[in-house]
Amino acid sequence: MVEEYYKADYDILAMTDHGVITNGWTSERETNGIFNKFRKVYPMSEENYERITKGLDRGGRGMTDIRGGIECNMAVISKTHVNGYFTTYGQGEWGIENDYRTAPVEIEKAGGYSVLNHVGDWVDSGRFPHRSHWNVYIAYFAGIFIDCPSCLGMEIVNNTDRVTRGDRDLWDELLQVVIPKGRNIWAFADDDSEKLNEVGRSFEFFVLPENNEANVKKAMKD
């Protein structure tokens, strides 16, 4: 998967597997039994890691490895998924149904950042766009962002945008609530790729003085 993103010309990559923390592409990872279909995870070789992170075969333009990545609430039917970055929380946690709040709170305690994933999947605004304007959802998500400064934002595009097509409207509604309180909400666009043919559907641009993990972390927040 990492190789596929490198071939697709990406410059930054965070691996956020369901309930599995990735502490670097060369590190061993513990998957979650039957939920992960007992898959064997093969760490990247040091040779390939150097080639990709230094861009040895694409003109010196390496791809940065973002560590501490995970998708929390891995097993919930309601799909209240939350991405964690630079975190130690979430390994093997099955999650709580209909709950977007617990993961950001716990990720903040662990010193990481979080992003709310495809909230339209839960709100069902892909099919019913007017739900993005319902006060019950606006108040719920605004409360999370106000209470958790390390919850940086929300996806407004996920994969092919089928479930997030109404999330731009919800994002706009939320900004009107939180900005007067001194808070911003960044918008994210993620592949949510679980298969190689899903690579390259969504991406973000980062303004960086130099492409490295520390600068990416700062840019995500600032």
Segments predicted by a language model, with ranges:
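Charged catalytic cores and adjacent phosphate/nucleic-acid-binding surfaces used
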Residues: 1, 77-88, 129-222
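A metal-dependent hydrolase metal-coordination microenvironment
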Residues: 1-129, 156-171, 190-193
